[in-house]
């Protein structure tokens, strides 16, 4: 695949129009707004930075790197182990349901784009979008760092768009938040990808509480 086609595939994977339901989950933000933990754009920036530093950098990205390398080796056993580890790190039923829902949606895309995708890999994709994205990146020969940039941007944009609806704040503030959060992401991405096994794990108890409480929140915009 040419460099131009790789870049275009990368932009497609980062697109907000990708039908995986990324804008239907708030990851606890809706309850955090309801209870008053997040009242404005400044509070949101603090909240999302915590999720980035203590969850995405310590769980999602390092496990994504391991999944990518497992796909390079065609090592289904290793990919299965890390997919299960990722799911175990999702601390609430809602977060695990989001992981599986996004995974199932992404699996449909992978099968449509790559009809000869091996049957042995498909159940792993259905458990986690990260596994499907890693496999597709290897198939399309997209470097891990480029794929990680796409993954991070998509995650941050989805979070900010949830904030626009819930906090709320305007589109100009949203773009400024995306800009600053992306700068923070770029600074920490390489270290997160190289994180050793002994340092894997999240530390976001408030986010876990918010997600658990959101499951029974009386009035909500986002799925649970």
UniProtKB/Swiss-Prot annotation:
Signal peptide: none
One GO cellular component term: cytoplasm
Gene3D superfamilies linked: Urease accessory protein UreF
Compartment annotation: Cytoplasm
Source species, domain of life: Bacteria
UniProt key word Cytoplasm: yes
Keywords, in A-Z order: Chaperone, Cytoplasm, Nickel insertion
Entry-linked InterPro entries: UreF (IPR002639), UreF_sf (IPR038277)
Pfam families: UreF (PF01730)
A molecular-function term among this protein's GO annotations: nickel cation binding
HAMAP family for this protein: UreF
Family to which this protein belongs: Belongs to the UreF family.
Subunit structure: UreD, UreF and UreG form a complex that acts as a GTP-hydrolysis-dependent molecular chaperone, activating the urease apoprotein by helping to assemble the nickel containing metallocenter of UreC. The UreE protein probably delivers the nickel.
The protein's role, per its UniProt record: Required for maturation of urease via the functional incorporation of the urease nickel metallocenter.
The name this protein goes by in its record: Urease accessory protein UreF
Species for this entry: Citrobacter koseri (strain ATCC BAA-895 / CDC 4225-83 / SGSC4696)
């Amino acid at each position: 695949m040419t460099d131009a086609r790789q870049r275009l595939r990368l932009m497609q994977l980062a697109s907000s129009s990708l039908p995986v339901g990324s804008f239907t989950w708030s990851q606890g933000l809706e309850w955090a707004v309801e209870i008053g933990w997040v009242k404005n754009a400044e509070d949101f920036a603090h909240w999302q930075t915590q999720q980035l530093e203590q969850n995405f950098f310590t769980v999602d990205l390092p496990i994504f790197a391991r999944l990518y390398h497992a796909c390079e080796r065609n090592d289904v056993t290793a990919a299965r182990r890390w997919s299960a580890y990722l799911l175990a790190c999702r601390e609430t039923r809602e977060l695990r349901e989001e992981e599986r829902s996004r995974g199932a949606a992404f699996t449909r895309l992978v099968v449509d784009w790559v009809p000869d995708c091996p049957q042995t890999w498909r159940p792993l994709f259905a458990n986690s979008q990260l596994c499907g994205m890693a496999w597709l990146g290897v198939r399309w020969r997209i470097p891990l760092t480029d794929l990680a940039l796409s993954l991070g941007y998509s995650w941050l944009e989805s979070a900010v768009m949830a904030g626009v609806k819930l906090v709320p704040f305007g589109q100009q503030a949203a773009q400024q938040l995306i800009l600053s959060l992306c700068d923070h992401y770029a600074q920490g991405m390489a270290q997160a990808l190289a994180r050793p096994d002994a340092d894997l794990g999240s530390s976001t108890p408030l986010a876990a509480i918010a997600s658990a409480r959101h499951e029974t929140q009386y009035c909500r915009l986002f799925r649970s």
